[in-house]
Swiss-Prot record:
Name the UniProt record assigns to this protein: Potassium-transporting ATPase KdpC subunit
Subcellular location: Cell inner membrane
Chief location of this protein within or outside the cell: membrane
GO cellular component: plasma membrane
Keyword field: ATP-binding, Cell inner membrane, Cell membrane, Ion transport, Membrane, Nucleotide-binding, Potassium, Potassium transport, Transmembrane, Transmembrane helix, Transport
Amino acid sequence: MNTYVRPALSLILLLAVVTGALYPLAVTGVAQVVFPEQANGSLVRDEQGQVRGSALIAQDFQGDGWFHSRPSAGAYATVASSASNLSPSNPALAERVAGDAAKLYQAGQGPVPQALLTTSGSGLDPHLPPQAVAYQIPRVAAARQIPVERLQALLEGATLHPLIGPPVVNVLALNQALSKFGL
């Protein structure tokens, strides 16, 4: 029996060291050299170098002077990141969407874009379609007393056109650019 146990335990120990230590260290080292910004979390910094968030994670922006992200089922917490898992027929989902729609519709800008009412699969999607951001421009312009045309130009400059998929806007990056206007 010892002839089988010793090689098996040795193999388990060897694989634990390789897959649990050597491989992660090698991948981290290569990532730090080749993609240092992404390896460190795609952090977004302000002019003073302070970290304001990650380009990969949505934030809860409050107040009329900011563009708002899409709703989050996990309160924008990375640990509790998840979808709501509520079915379309669930009354709790219908109540939340109706409440959000009523708040957004008060601005009187027409039908509310779906992206401002629905959560993403992770609950932390940092991107919105340009139409959902454009819907918020009159509210932000009024709160900051900035011409609508200036915010539309800011939106056009912040719109990303990925190789695959529709155009998107990173709300954190857009609000970072907006912060340069002051409040």
